[in-house]
Regions:
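Interfacial loop-to-transmembrane junctions
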Residues: 111-113, 146-172
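Functional transmembrane core segments of multi-pass inner-membrane proteins
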Residues: 28-36, 40-140, 183-187
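Alpha-helical membrane-inserting segments
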Residues: 14-22, 65-66, 70, 93, ...
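N-terminal transmembrane signal-anchor/hairpin module of polytopic inner-membrane proteins
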Residues: 1-25, 182-187
């Protein structure tokens, strides 16, 4: 089916980009495995509205391992305490949204898979990445959902998989996070 072609094409493009962008083999291997896990999560959540724990835990394990590999400090936070704080802040930021939504609406909203995914992003980039990643993900989700809502193709009660937006926001942070923060600090 077309979905398999798209996944394989994106995996190939991602691997090529990683291979051409980094010269440290530790970085290349780590980033390729992370990219593959994120790609699986993205498509599983799009299709089934779930994020398998095994994939989220894989990200967290890789995020912890990266603290002990050489020459990764330019890409990710390499301070184990910042990494741990990032995981906790990432998880709690989504957990708080889930909790408040349930208290206000009296029903389930997001799942804890999104919280675990955000924990993995926090473990990778540190706590300081969480506000920007969450903002970008929310903005992307809103921009994608608005046309369907305005055309009344979807209602406010429609399910929206959030992992693709968290993953995209994490990628934006990975590529442009420092630039975005410099722009924000100037403003």
């Amino acid at each position: 089916p077309l979905q398999y072609f798209i996944i394989e094409f994106l995996a190939g493009l991602g691997f090529l980009f990683i291979f051409l962008s980094f010269d440290n083999y530790y970085s290349i291997i780590l980033l390729m495995v992370l990219f593959l896990i994120y790609l699986m999560i993205l498509f599983i959540d799009l299709k089934h509205f779930i994020i398998p724990d095994i994939l989220n835990y894989g990200i967290i394990v890789l995020a912890i391992i990266k603290n002990f590999l050489p020459n990764l400090d330019l890409i990710f936070t390499q301070d184990i305490m910042l990494s741990l704080a990032g995981g906790i802040v990432g998880y709690l930021s989504i957990w708080l949204i889930i909790y408040l939504y349930k208290q206000i609406r009296k029903k389930e909203g997001m799942g804890l898979g999104d919280a675990k995914l955000m924990a993995g992003i926090g473990f990778l980039f540190g706590w300081q990445s969480i506000p920007l990643v969450l903002f970008i993900a929310s903005l992307l989700a809103l921009l994608v959902a608005m046309p369907s809502l305005m055309a009344k193709k979807k209602g406010l009660k429609s399910k929206i998989p959030f992992a693709p937006y968290l993953i995209t926001a994490g990628l934006v942070y990975f590529l442009y996070g420092n630039v975005i923060y410099k722009i924000v600090l100037v403003i």
